[in-house]
């Protein structure tokens, strides 16, 4: 098996020596699981990395702690930014920030508020909203000529039903500022709309949109000063909405090597258009799009962050690079010096245990190791005795196996 950090060491971008040192505020440097790797990326590029989150420092993963030069716990960081940001300013004192980074969806707007309060360059609050509010997002893209699903915004049960009549069936109901496929429902008639409404009482605003029947892909980028420096095409098998509603499925995310294939050409072109229309400047983006049976390509949604569920690891395995450090170079210096050679298809297969309770045995793993050998990049399964996770509330379920092949 391949150690993603060791594998990428010789490809890690050298820290820039001809520019002044950078000081970066990293929001949630230890969570989700990939964040310590992004924190490390900033550090190896020569930045002084300061961390802030709502949890105590001792709970941070060791990798994150090792690459931080300071950490502030702000319990109200996400619940009351108006109170938390002045506390952050007092803690910083005379220190000046060059960048504010957050690669976790719930913190994208927060990061923009901190930038504006402290006068730090980067994505503004208005720009961030176009990546968080699906209505604003689709309005901007439709005006720019991008094919988006027909949709309507709803805040009450009555508005949801009215929107359903306007959009037509089948349709999707999902949070206006959600992430992934959580709290997302397909409805084929008014009765199913009522069932969805009963489960969405904790969501203030929803998007009711046309259901696009097709295969689902991603278009992910690292941008620097408005330039797309790196892009990635991913493929979900099956589409997440199906995987989220069928427990027996082992969901797969495929990193597709043949980025010039006609199968994905229109989606790639759409992705480039979306970045241009939204005026994205610097950082990671994660876009989802659909290809219908008749070949039509339809936009899904886009986020100003990397994909989750270890997909950046997939990108690294596919090209033997370190995109955690590559992203950091773009963020800090506006450059991207990694050489990208698309060597492999790579896939992450998520596993769900059978039954309830604790993991009692793992079947078939030895056969997989014997059969696939060097094609296995990583195996991360819950150890025996561990309680099974709630498969509906986690993307990685009870663990995963990552493979690659030319």
Q: Each PLM stretch: what is its role?
A:
Residues 1-7, 11, 25, 49, ...:
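Peripheral (often C-terminal) accessory segments that flank ATP-dependent C-N-forming ligase machineries
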